[in-house]
A protein has these predicted regions:
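Conserved catalytic cores of phosphodiester-cleaving nucleases, focusing on short active-site segments
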Residues: 351, 355, 380-399, 418
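Domain-level recognition of nuclease-like catalytic cores that cleave nucleotide substrates
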Residues: 426-457
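Interdomain motor-coupling "hinge/lid" segment immediately C-terminal to the ATP-binding subdomain
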Residues: 131-249
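Conserved lysine of the Walker
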Residues: 35
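Accessory nucleic acid-recognition modules appended to NTPase machines
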Residues: 201-378, 384
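Short glycine-rich substrate-engagement loop in P-loop NTPases that contacts/grips substrate
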Residues: 56-88
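N-terminal pre-Walker A segment at the start of P-loop NTPase domains
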Residues: 1-16
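Hydrophobic positions on the alpha1 helix immediately C-terminal to the Walker A/P-loop
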Residues: 38, 42
Length: 457
């Protein structure tokens, strides 16, 4: 039996189980991020675990045809798979539910007609199927979004719970011992290559073989592209494949449609990007003025960067495209921390992924950055809401004098708090803005291996 690796969503599933007003749960996310494994592990909390996989159990699809009687459906499933389905004792798991649109439509009726039964559904590319459904139970179904493993989960997989606890005690000017800091930096470098796909992480913990991980990552990418072909009646699979791969070449950069492909119009690439976003494969980081909350009130979707769902998969795409340079690998493995942060678009992307994944998983999260209008190249990598205030976050390593964009933004928006995220140790400093009536502003240095602390401090 495959070893299960602790996931952040485990606690969300337990909370859902104990909620007396729970709704059927729809677990959403890209293929192979660990949805099924998380539910199967969670199933140990129940006396019985009744699993239906619509890719393998095609006959069960017929149970959902015609008039929907969910109690009768549950009885039929119980008889077919020979597992008791009893309210309060059984977890009913409907996996790969995108293969049975009728089952998606039936989820709402479990809330209305069989609310005492614990029901979880999961699937990949669900949004492609949901687009064709008139409704799938808004208000009667609870969604959770799942992603590849965060850096903290990666540390758990490597049995470094003690290292996490030590790190969590450091903050501001309370820096880590250099030995622990160096160890976390090395783990972060490894994470950039191994990524967070559970199969790749598990392979790394067993073999410490980067090539084994890369083979797994390439297989996952090819599986994604095979999935696109299943929806060729709705969208051109080559367009999705071209857009997905083209995005990877612009990691950490402002997205330019023309650089993705000259064979497709911008409107076609924009639609492919929308579908890849819905499928959880990419996440746009949209430019915003940063004048107030909410950040999307003044967002400009014509200016965006794009986060690919996993750093390891990103490098696998570049490998498949013949564009993964040895220089980039050497930068990740052996470049100085300053070079890795300031020159590596992958590092900026991972920082965005980390910040997104530590937010509540009950909705698809939006990400924002700031760029000054006009000819200036001033830019803030990310804008976050921290303690109900707009907080600029720079992914850079350097001295105070190298923070021109950060200083400009804080002065323009009259902000007093900011974060600089790099591979430096924990720290902080104040500076006096001589161009703004000697206003005192505070910058916290947060290591990239500690972005999970951003929301808790």
């Amino acid at each position: 039996m495959t070893e299960y690796i602790h996931r952040n969503i485990d606690s969300e599933l337990i909370a859902w189980k104990e909620d007396s007003m729970r709704k059927p749960l729809l677990l959403r996310g890209a293929r192979q991020v660990g949805k099924s494994s998380a539910v199967k592990n969670f199933g140990k909390q129940f006396e019985y675990f009744a699993e239906v996989n619509f890719e393998r159990n095609k006959a069960i699809k017929t149970f959902f045809q015609g008039d929907i009687d969910v109690r009768l459906i549950a009885k039929k499933i119980s008889s077919y798979i020979n597992v008791p389905i009893e309210a309060g004792k059984t977890l009913l798991f409907l996996d790969e539910i995108q293969e049975c649109p009728e089952a998606i439509m039936a989820l709402r009726f479990f809330k209305e007609d069989y609310p005492e039964l614990h029901v979880i559904a999961a699937g990949s590319l669900l949004e492609f199927t949901l687009q064709e459904l008139p409704t799938f139970g808004v208000g009667r179904i609870h969604s959770l979004f799942m992603y590849p493993m965060t850096f903290d989960e990666f540390l758990y997989a490597n049995h470094e719970e003690g290292l996490i606890l030590l790190r969590n005690e450091a903050y501001g000017n309370q820096s880590l011992d250099q030995a622990f800091h160096d160890k976390l930096v090395e783990y972060f470098r490894t994470y950039l290559l191994v990524g967070g796909m559970p199969e790749s992480v598990l392979a790394w913990t067993k073999t410490h073989d980067f090539n084994r991980c890369r083979n797994i990552q390439e297989d996952i990418i090819l599986t994604y592209e095979d999935d696109f072909s299943k929806y060729k009646k709705r969208v051109n699979p080559d367009l999705l494949r071209t857009t997905m791969r083209g995005i990877c070449h612009q990691a950490g950069e402002k997205l330019t449609y023309k650089q993705i492909s000259a064979d497709y119009q911008s409107s076609q690439i924009r639609e492919a990007l929308r579908l890849l976003t819905l499928a959880g494969i990419v996440t746009p980081v949209v430019a915003t003025s940063g004048n107030g909350i909410p950040l999307d009130a003044e967002a400009d979707e014509k200016s965006m960067k794009v986060l690919f769902l996993d750093p390891g998969l990103l490098l696998a795409v570049l490998q498949l495209e013949g564009d993964l340079s040895q220089q980039l690998i050497e930068l990740i493995l052996a470049g100085t921390p300053q070079e890795l942060v300031n020159k590596g678009g992958v590092t900026e992307m991972v920082a965005g992924l980390e910040m997104m994944r530590y937010k509540p998983c009950i909705q698809r999260q939006k990400m924002f950055y700031w760029e000054q209008k006009g000819k200036s190249v001033a830019e803030i990598d990310y804008l976050e809401i921290h303690n109900m205030k707009i907080t600029p976050i720079e992914i850079k390593s350097g001295t105070q004098g190298g923070m021109k964009s950060l200083r400009l933004f804080m002065r323009e928006k009259k902000l007093t708090e900011a974060f600089r995220c790099s591979l430096e140790n924990f720290g902080s400093f104040d500076y006096i803005d001589k161009q703004d009536d000697d206003a005192i502003r505070h910058v916290t240095i947060l290591p990239l291996y500690a972005l999970s602390l951003l929301r808790s401090r």
